[in-house]
Amino acid sequence: TLFIVTSKTFTTAETLANAGLAKSWLEDNGVAPSTAMAAVTAYDMRARDWGIPDAQIFSFAEGVGGRYSLWSAVGLSVMIAIGSKNFSEMLAGAHAMDRHVREADFGQNLGVIMGLLRVWHRSYLKASTYGLMPYDQRLSRLPAWAQQLEMESNGKQVNRAGQPLDAPAGPLIWGEPGTNSQ
């Protein structure tokens, strides 16, 4: 068993509480936490102070935002789950899409088209919710992931100066697998 404690600042209360439970479970079962725990963080010293050995600390830049973190060391658990070859292919696909969004003309640019459709649906058609209903159990957590991503990225009602936005922000995301959502 390997516990990967992932926290950008290594101060997130809920994450550290869960990590503490894992650490206690390991100790209660005669396993040294330093042999079964790793950390992914932008603050190596805090992970080290918490007891994670240097060789098991995977760093990423402090400027990496949550919505982009999968492509950094935060993707460690994904890489373990799907294998390094598949993870490398996923990174290559993301890179290809990044290049497309940067270089494609607006009329053919999938990122621009999808973004404009979201603005159209939310602001002009007044579609305030978005249902996500995967019909494959392997995607059962996709709605929850999309909710978190949407709220982190677009769920704000004020701008950086704290002033109310002139237009509605992103829609409310909801859903469950298949017929449960209907």
Predicted segments with their positions:
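Active-site phosphate/pyrophosphate-binding segments
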Residues: 18, 25-182
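Well-ordered mid-protein domain cores that form the structural environment of catalytic cofactors
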Residues: 1-26
